């Protein structure tokens, strides 16, 4: 495949992990921020289609490679045929599961090809396992709920960054969904616990962890949290949004037929 030939072959554990992260980021984009475009490309009327992720964090829907056996393990074949026969959420979850399987297959293909020993394989798996899966991010089951991102940037004057003193109820926070999440019920003695929770918070688009110097926004529909840059929302733009819908929720509307 043309996209695969453009990237150097990883040979060390770190290089294989970097390759894995790049491909994973591309697949996450396809199933979250670019989901509308992805949905349209996966046409059931076309031949067997696959979803590919590349090391440069891009993705592509294409036919499988013609060479047999292929140079790399191939992703699930014919994902387009089930698109209209399932609920959209279930179909995307299925694609995400197969995407995770493919990512592992590619990573350990490189490991086998370049003779990784037991310790290298174990280290590679641990590095991979420390990241949320594509499935977890695409379905919102990764740790990123309002209960996990709490008061950040204490002392900040921004209305979109809640401080340790601004403990608000759910009804009060609805109007400032762009701020870091606030717990509904928080005791003063839980602040240390909150710091631990926020370490595991991840963006629903790119899968990266929360950074205190970054702007985040929460979807009012699915309650996933996203980097503003990942969903192309700035603090200024967010100020005029009454109810924010992420790209995935924006296309979830009744389909005829």
Curated annotation (Swiss-Prot):
A zinc finger (PHD-type) spans 200-252. One of its GO terms (cellular component) is nucleus. Pfam families: Alfin, PHD. It comes from the Eukaryota. Residues 187-199 have a biased composition (Acidic residues). GO terms for molecular function: DNA binding; histone binding; transcription cis-regulatory region binding; transcription coregulator activity; zinc ion binding. It is found in: Nucleus. Residues 145-200 are annotated as: Disordered. GO terms for biological process: cellular response to salt stress; chromatin organization; positive regulation of translation; regulation of DNA-templated transcription; response to salt stress. The record marks 210, 216, 220, 225 as: Histone H3K4me3 binding. PANTHER family: CPG BINDING PROTEIN, PHD FINGER PROTEIN ALFIN-LIKE 6. Belongs to the Alfin family. The PHD-type zinc finger mediates the binding to H3K4me3. This is PHD finger protein Alfin1. It comes from Medicago sativa (Alfalfa). The lineage of its organism: Eukaryota, Viridiplantae, Streptophyta, Embryophyta, Tracheophyta. The gene is ALFIN-1.
């Amino acid at each position: 495949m043309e996209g695969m030939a453009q990237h150097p072959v990883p040979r060390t554990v770190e290089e294989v992990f970097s390759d894995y992260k790049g491909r994973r980021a591309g697949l996450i984009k396809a199933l979250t921020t670019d989901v509308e475009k992805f949905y349209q490309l996966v046409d059931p009327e076309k031949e067997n289609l696959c979803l590919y992720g590349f090391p440069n964090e891009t993705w592509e829907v294409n036919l499988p490679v013609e060479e047999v056996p292929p140079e790399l393990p191939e992703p699930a074949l014919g994902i387009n045929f089930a698109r209209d026969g399932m609920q959209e959420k279930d179909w995307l979850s299925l694609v995400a599961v197969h995407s995770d399987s493919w990512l592992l297959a590619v990573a350990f293909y490189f490991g086998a090809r370049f003779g990784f020993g037991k310790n290298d394989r174990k280290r590679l798996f641990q590095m991979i396992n420390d990241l949320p899966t594509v499935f977890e991010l695409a379905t919102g089951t990764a740790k990123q709920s309002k209960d996990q991102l709490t008061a950040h940037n204490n002392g900040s004057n921004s209305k979109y960054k809640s401080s340790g003193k601004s403990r608000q109820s759910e009804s009060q926070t609805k109007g400032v969904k762009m701020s870091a999440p606030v717990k509904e019920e928080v005791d003063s003695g839980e602040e240390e616990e909150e710091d631990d929770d926020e370490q595991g918070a991840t963006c629903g688009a790119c899968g990266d962890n929360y950074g205190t110097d970054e702007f985040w926004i929460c979807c009012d529909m699915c309650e996933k949290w996203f980097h503003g840059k990942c969903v192309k929302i700035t603090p200024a733009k967010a100020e005029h949004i009454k109810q924010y819908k992420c790209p995935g929720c924006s296309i979830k509307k009744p389909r005829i037929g």
